[in-house]
């Protein structure tokens, strides 16, 4: 086995988590995130295409994509928690997300998930975060 193969076997991507902080009103709190794998990303993208049957006019729903990324890749807090949804008076994770976070906070969390999923320039910083 090559050194790269050994590294990849010893460092599977299914157990990576990273704690991050956002700015503004949430600067004192940590969110725990997990990266997206290729299958998840493909599924989210397919769910976010508007007019999928129309060959001429297809649109991508960025807001829905960000919501799916955050709901499914933020470990803490858990936006799928039924007790939290009930206490917030909502029925879905999407409704909870939009009740407790601002649009920019949702976008920022989605961006952070994308970064730890291998998209972005700061791979050295992410490697340090993963080690901690």
What are these regions (language model features)?
Residues 1-13, 123-132:
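Low-complexity intrinsically disordered segments
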Residues 14-27:
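Short acidic-hydrophobic surface loop/beta-edge motif
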Residues 15, 33-35:
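Long, low-complexity, highly charged intrinsically disordered regions that are enriched for acidic
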Residues 13-15, 57-58:
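A general, composition-driven signal for non-globular sequence regions
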Residues 29, 36-132:
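Short, surface-exposed, charged amphipathic helix/loop patches that serve as local interaction elements
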């Amino acid at each position: 086995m090559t050194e790269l193969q050994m590294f990849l076997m010893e460092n599977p991507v299914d157990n990576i988590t990273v704690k991050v902080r956002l700015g503004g009103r949430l600067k004192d709190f940590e969110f725990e995130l997990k990266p997206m794998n290729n299958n998840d990303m493909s599924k989210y993208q397919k769910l976010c295409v508007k007019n999928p049957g129309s060959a001429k006019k297809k649109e991508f729903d960025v807001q829905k994509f960000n919501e799916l990324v955050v709901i499914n890749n933020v470990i803490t807090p858990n936006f799928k928690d039924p007790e939290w949804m009930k206490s917030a008076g909502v029925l879905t994770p999407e409704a909870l997300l939009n009740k407790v976070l601002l649009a920019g906070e949702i976008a920022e969390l989605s961006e952070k998930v994308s970064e730890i999923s291998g998209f972005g320039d700061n791979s050295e910083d992410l490697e340090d975060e993963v080690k901690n």
